[in-house]
């Protein structure tokens, strides 16, 4: 899929005078040069229909919708993404006429034939059409077989990354069922993003990990959630507050072998303070100046004192480039700040009991708030792998995963990195001296050093190697 973005240089100026990503022939030729020969789809809204001021039209504002369609096919598009809301089949048919008038019917037909071929091949390769009637019992026997379950378990084990282990876990198999304290974690439910808008969400208390799954491996001690005592929500029922919990006492925790805290990685999105509410609901903006909140990869509030100013990106529809810099602005505490508070309580009450954090992540995060409070840290991607974490604690499986993102030393380190250069960030270093860099991970023997880490230790790319973008642009400009 192509993009909406305008190609810009490091100062935010249009790069090469070319069309936006949706129409940029150099972006498409990148795929051609590396041997890609399959379906190419555009992002939504790049031909019109979502308003003439949408970002997808950059560089083609003066063209009609059929002219944009023709240009898209000419540049390499196979599918017009989300086209149902645009000018309909009439605009597409007229787009073909524009294309045929420009390059001739024979070449225009070849382009559309290739687009249809790529689409049909991809759809047929899914295998959904040759036999639409399947035996569900037979399918279940394959999907839920012992072999499939074993494969899934092995894959989950391999995906978990251990980034800290202060000698707590040795891989020695446990012969008895340990006792573990698992605290509940609080989330405000707040979210904000450009597509869905601002949502205050529904506050909740949930166990950090699946207690039913953990019960197969441990004797579990946990907290008690009381009745919700907050203000009424849209459904008329009271919302949960941070006070609607009774934590396990020091006496209850004292007999535990481990404290296990399940957490979601810290992340607050950047958004415009005048962003409308989710699903079109009204939002009172009285007294709110318009500005951008900083993104944040830490749980606590973050003031972006070292952020870029002016911003690289910014709306240019009105002729002048908008400055979206959030320098000096403050990101609120993460909606999951209560996850950090659960860890803080666990660390305070644990005494000599080892504290293990199991963190589910979708990106990097700043570890200064978390790492000093833990004896062991496991990282899972996208979702908690409760079974895998439990097996590793019990010595039934060995962690073998590697970090797929650099983990920043600080928010300032994030601001200091170059936006389009990979692996150029100052990474977090923990109390043991280990640096949470790309491809870092630990097993029972210590820091992993194998063929994978040697391969991934190559110097990061600082220029495109498979396609010399700059020379192509110079040639095009000269012509």
Label each residue range with its predicted role.
Residues 1-65, 89-106, 114, 121, ...:
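C-terminal non-catalytic regions of proteins with extracellular/luminal or membrane-system context
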Residues 117, 124-139:
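Conserved, charged catalytic cores of large soluble enzymes
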Residues 73-82, 86-89:
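Mobile "lid/hinge" segments at catalytic clefts and subdomain interfaces of large enzymes
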Residues 84-85, 130-136, 171-174:
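Short coil/turn segments at secondary-structure boundaries
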Residues 32, 65-76, 120-125:
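Conserved short secondary-structure transition element at the edge of the structured enzyme core
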Residues 78, 125-132, 165-169:
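Intrinsically disordered or highly flexible coil/loop and linker segments, enriched in small
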């Amino acid at each position: 899929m192509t993009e909406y973005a305008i190609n810009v240089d490091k100062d935010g100026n249009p790069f090469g005078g070319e069309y936006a990503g949706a129409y940029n022939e150099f972006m498409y030729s990148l795929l051609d040069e590396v041997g890609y020969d399959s379906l190419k789809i555009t992002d939504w809204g790049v031909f019109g229909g979502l308003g003439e001021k949408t970002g997808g039209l950059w560089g083609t504002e003066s063209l009609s919708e059929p002219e944009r369609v023709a240009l898209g096919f000419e540049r390499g598009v196979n599918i017009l993404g989300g086209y149902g809301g645009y000018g309909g089949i009439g605009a597409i048919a007229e787009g073909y006429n524009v294309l045929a008038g420009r390059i001739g019917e024979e070449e225009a037909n070849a382009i559309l034939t290739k687009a249809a071929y790529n689409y049909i091949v991809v759809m047929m390769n899914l295998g959904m059409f040759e036999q639409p009637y399947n035996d569900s019992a037979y399918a279940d026997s394959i999907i839920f077989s012992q072999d499939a379950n074993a494969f899934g378990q092995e894959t989950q084990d391999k995906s978990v990354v251990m980034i800290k282990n202060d000698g707590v876990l040795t891989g020695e198999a446990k012969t008895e069922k340990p006792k573990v304290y698992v605290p509940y974690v609080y989330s405000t439910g707040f979210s904000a993003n450009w597509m869905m808008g601002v949502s205050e969400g529904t506050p909740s208390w949930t166990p950090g990990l699946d207690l039913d799954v953990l019960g197969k491996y441990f004797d579990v001690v946990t907290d008690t959630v009381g009745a919700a005592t907050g203000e009424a929500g849209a459904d008329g029922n009271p919302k949960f507050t941070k006070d609607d919990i009774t934590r396990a006492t020091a006496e209850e925790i004292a007999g535990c072998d481990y404290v296990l805290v399940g957490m979601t990685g810290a992340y607050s999105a950047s958004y415009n303070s005048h962003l409308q509410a989710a699903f079109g609901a009204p939002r009172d903006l009285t007294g709110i100046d318009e500005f951008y909140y900083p993104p944040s990869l830490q749980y606590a509030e973050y003031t972006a004192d070292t952020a870029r100013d002016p911003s690289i990106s910014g709306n240019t529809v009105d002729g002048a480039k908008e400055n979206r810099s959030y320098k000096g602005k403050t990101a609120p505490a993460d909606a999951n700040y209560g996850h950090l508070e659960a860890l803080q309580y666990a660390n305070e009450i644990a005494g000599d009991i080892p504290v293990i954090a199991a963190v589910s992540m979708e990106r990097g995060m700043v570890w200064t708030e978390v790492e000093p409070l833990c004896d062991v840290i496991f990282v899972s991607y996208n979702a908690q792998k409760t079974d895998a974490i439990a097996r590793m604690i019990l010595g039934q499986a060995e962690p073998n995963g590697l970090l797929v993102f650099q983990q920043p030393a600080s928010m300032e380190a994030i601001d200091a990195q170059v936006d389009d250069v990979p692996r150029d960030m100052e990474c977090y270093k923990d109390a043991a001296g280990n640096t949470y860099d790309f491809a870092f991970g630990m097993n029972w023997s210590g820091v992993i050093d194998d063929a994978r880490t040697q391969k991934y230790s190559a110097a990061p790319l600082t220029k495109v190697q498979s396609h010399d973008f700059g020379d192509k642009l110079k040639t095009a400009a000269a012509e």
